[in-house]
Amino acid sequence: MFRRPVLQVLRQFVRHESETASSLVLERSLNRVHLLGRVGQDPVLRQVEGKNPVTIFSLATNEMWRSGDSEVYQLGDISQKTTWHRISVFRPGLRDVAYQYVKKGSRIYLEGKIDYGEYMDKNNVRRQATTIIADNIIFLSDQTKEKE
């Protein structure tokens, strides 16, 4: 009794390999990045002719772990790895706020997406660049207040 309507509904969501490209349905995917770290340099505002302006800065995140073969976890040596991320802010309001208030040493939390791009360097060699495109920035500390 309900078998036919259920199958019709399921066919809307399930696609088979035999279907052609003309019947492609957009499916959801997720490209989301959450970073918490310290700013490595004051931001720069870049404007390339014919393109949107962008605020760019670097963000350091740290990963820490204990090493050693000790049975007692607390006795191992602490190791740390710092990873640097290139952050690009294109959204007009956020771009201007980031340029004005993000400072070297500030602790921030940001949300965005990862982007893999290519560009030609000065020697006409194709290079790859990974950047985080920020959608939201939360300021957790102000470096100028911490110095006082």
Swiss-Prot record:
Modified residues (N6-succinyllysine): K122
CDD domains, A to Z: SSB_OBF (cd04496)
Subcellular location field: Mitochondrion; Mitochondrion matrix, Mitochondrion nucleoid
Location of N6-acetyllysine modifications: K113
S-S bonds: none
Pfam families, sorted: SSB
SUPFAM superfamilies named among the record's database cross-references: Nucleic acid-binding proteins (SSF50249)
Main localization category: mitochondrion
Keyword Transit peptide among record annotations: yes
InterPro entries: NA-bd_OB-fold, Primosome_PriB/ssb, ssDNA-bd
Domain SSB: 30-141
Transit peptide in keyword set: yes
GO molecular function, one term: chromatin binding
Subunit structure of this chain's protein: Homotetramer. Interacts with MPG/AAG, through inhibition of its glycosylase activity it potentially prevents formation of DNA breaks in ssDNA, ensuring that base removal primarily occurs in dsDNA. Interacts with POLDIP2. Interacts with PRIMPOL.
Protein purpose: Binds preferentially and cooperatively to pyrimidine rich single-stranded DNA (ss-DNA). In vitro, required to maintain the copy number of mitochondrial DNA (mtDNA) and plays a crucial role during mtDNA replication by stimulating the activity of the replisome components POLG and TWNK at the replication fork. Promotes the activity of the gamma complex polymerase POLG, largely by organizing the template DNA and eliminating secondary structures to favor ss-DNA conformations that facilitate POLG activity. In addition it is able to promote the 5'-3' unwinding activity of the mtDNA helicase TWNK.
NCBIfam families: ssb
Name assigned to this protein: Single-stranded DNA-binding protein, mitochondrial
Organism annotation: Pongo abelii (Sumatran orangutan)
